[in-house]
Every structure is written in structure tokens, then in C-alpha cells.
Amino acid sequence: MILGLGMDVVEVARIERILAGPPARVDRFLERCFTARERAYCDAARDRATRYAARFAAKEAASKALGAPAGIRFTDVEVVRGAGAPVLELAGVAATAAARLGVRRVLVTLTHDGGVAAATVVLDGEEAR
């Protein structure tokens, strides 16, 4: 049963502008929004801004799918590499909200084209009673 659905779109140029900013501001943004694993993955790529944009979109989409729970942090949602497809790992407020909803599986898809990155998140499970 689908318990939640979220979608988000991010302009890659917006992330490029942030990454081109003062180093202290860039570091603050990256540490607030992305886990160490996400930063390592994105920073190793030539298309760094695109990878960050797609992951940012996934975090926003997950928050929407969960009903935008109060206190959720960007780092509560982590995009990790799965076997051929990205996987979302939830922690903190996101994990608590998912458990409360009865979520058993989180599906995510990422895409980018024409300067835009997008993500869709589907929460699957049995409705909590």
C-alpha cells in the first residue's frame, strides 16, 4: 500500500552558485544538508553540482512523502548507492515518522536533464493502526 508520495525538482545552477560561494558558506551548506558519505560521493564526480542537486531533491521529496514532520533535518535522509539504483536510508525524525506511518520500504528515483535534477519518493507499507 502506498503510504506517501513526494516529488521535488532542483535547478542545478542554484547548487552551482552555492558551491561557488565563500568556502565557509559552502562548508556550512554541505555539512547541514549532506552526510559524509553523500559528500564523498558527490565530490568525487565531475558533475558534482548535478549529484548534489539530485540528492537535495530526494531529501525534499522524502520530507514531502513523510508529511513534512516537524524537526526533520536534511541529514535524516541519506541517498546511498544501491546495487544499480539509489537507496534512501532514514535516521532521526525521518525514521521515526516512517515507523509511525507503517513504512516498510522506501523507493526513490533520481534524474537530471537540461539543467534540472528531480527525485520522486514512494513510501510503501501497511498503514499503522
Swiss-Prot record:
Keywords: Cytoplasm, Fatty acid biosynthesis, Fatty acid metabolism, Lipid biosynthesis, Lipid metabolism, Magnesium, Metal-binding, Transferase. Its cofactor is Mg(2+). GO terms for biological process: fatty acid biosynthetic process. Transmembrane segments: none annotated. It is an enzyme of class 2 (transferase). The keyword Magnesium applies. It is found in: Cytoplasm. Belongs to the P-Pant transferase superfamily. AcpS family. This is Holo-[acyl-carrier-protein] synthase. It comes from Anaeromyxobacter sp. (strain Fw109-5).
